[in-house]
Amino acid sequence: MDTALYLLPVTLGDTDVEQVLPAYNKEIILGIKHFIVEDVRSARRFLKKVERSIDIDELTFYPLNKHTPHEVVASYLEPLINGHSIGVISEAGCPAVADPGADVVAIAQRKNLKVVPLVGPSSIILSVMGSGFNGQSFAFHGYLPIEPSERIKRIKELESRIYTEHQTQLFIETPYRNHKMMEDIIKTCRPTTKLCIAANITCEGEYIKTKTVKEWKGKLPDINKIPCIFLIYK
């Protein structure tokens, strides 16, 4: 395998690795000794799911989150500069997409280091695929404001975009606040605006359903404490 910064997708939940990741990913992972990870504990657990016999103690982990100083992130690439491949692992899904891993990729690109993204599950892409919404123009906004009036204002702004820019809008909420988010969307958006609720993607109990706001009213699913993406479109 080429010496590179490998972007290693992980499962979105307790799904079997074989169900969502190509066998090629395992080959690459077994050839890497250095990992830049969002969470060391979950990264170790994922690697054991990939190969039970893997010796975790032989591996080196470099923690990366939104608070990691730029100079520390840059120092993590020293093994790669010295000829050793590095893997980047997020807590769930694809690293560097709505994820701190983007910072280390940006530094690697500036240093002209080889970057190789591998195939794996992205809740953003999968939810767009399953929604029936515009897949040529879409935007993911992460978390919306917690403060009620600011949240309502933001939802209205995003709804405006689906009509003026013909762009699918995606956002998330802390799982235990999912129901409140659904209620805010229902009371804020036009009755004809379409809402897709995509929960537990690739996992047991997966739920992906698109209806108009009017059709959702009074018939919201029980997705409390379940990872979910909300999508709106015209």
For the regions a language model picked out, list residue spans one by one.
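Glycine-rich, flexible N-terminal cofactor/catalytic loop recognition
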Residues: 1-64
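A contiguous loop/helix-start segment that scaffolds small-molecule binding in enzyme catalytic cores
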Residues: 2-6, 84-85, 164-234
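Class I SAM-dependent methyltransferase SAM-binding "motif I" and its flanking Rossmann-like core
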Residues: 6, 103-161
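Short glycine-rich anion-binding loops that position phosphate/pyrophosphate groups of nucleotides
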Residues: 12-14, 91-95, 175-176
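Short active-site oxyanion
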Residues: 29-35, 112-116, 168-169
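Alpha-helix capping/helix-boundary segments
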Residues: 41-43, 93, 123, 177
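Conserved helicase motor
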Residues: 62-69, 144-148
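Glycine/small-residue-rich loop that forms an oxyanion/phosphate-binding "nest" at active or ligand-binding sites
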Residues: 65, 73-115
